[in-house]
Amino acid sequence: MRVFGIIAGIVITALIAMGGLVHALDVADVVREWTPEGKKLAAERVKLPAHDEMVLIPAGSFTMGSDRKIDHNAYQAEFPQRKVYVDAYEIDKFEVTTVQYLKFILAKDLAPLIDWQYDGGNFQETMVNHPVMHVSWDDANAYCKWAEKRLPTSAEWEKAARGEDGRIYPWGNQPAGLSRANFGRTGLSGPVRDRPERLLLYPPIVSVDKYENAVSPYGVYQMSGNVAEWTNDWYDQNYYKTAPDRNPKGPERGTQKAFRGGGWIDSTPSVRPAQRNGAGPNTKMNWLGFRCAKDVKDSGESQNAKPQ
């Protein structure tokens, strides 16, 4: 078991070597334990309101992937662009929050996440509506099953983010900016320079309901930036070349799980919803969270529903 002091030392050394720029630290092998005071406080925090709303995404086709003639930031993993049909489903309107995940942790009697005790404290009230982070794909999958949901497929995630028309960002084709998304926050400044490990363990993320002006055509929040999000698929850079035209679910096997959306640490190209990447299922990062999806029985209502 590695202790917090060792991790903090590694972080500080890394930051000095990188000249004050924040890079992510995988904390998959870090184990924390509840203090009696911390668990008591968590039992109170878990009573606070949570964002549990889901959004219906209607059955139908959407434009998946990118066309470099239109999007000059497109990566190889986004080609070719084409129409794909996806059955109706529901997806969380917001990223899973710390208080939602706390309910799961307490119900399963699991250890707290590393950032829940940052800066010598315990689960802070200011964290309640922040997206959960430092969760592996296995953690995210377990939570969704516990909540009687599932992780969205990569195609479902992309459709919920972009709508039907292949727009570059959830709000349209206008470039990403800090008025619409939380991204590009990699510099150390002010008091943070004296406590760089605090920034890595609890970075500059924002509440999941911020940026109402940047929701997707279906009203889904923060599909660009804040934290990137795990999906159910295995990741293969070349998958779009052979993916089926109906309900693609990713490769049958792999070594990495796909994540989407980019996080606070990423640059503009990486917060485009078409961008795909992957990481090992056990990876836990301070820019990586998730949201859940749910199957629905198709109906005339879901067939006829349209994005805004």
Regions inferred by a protein language model and the residue ranges of each:
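Bacterial N-terminal signal peptides
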Residues: 9-17
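N-terminal Sec-pathway targeting helices
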Residues: 1-10
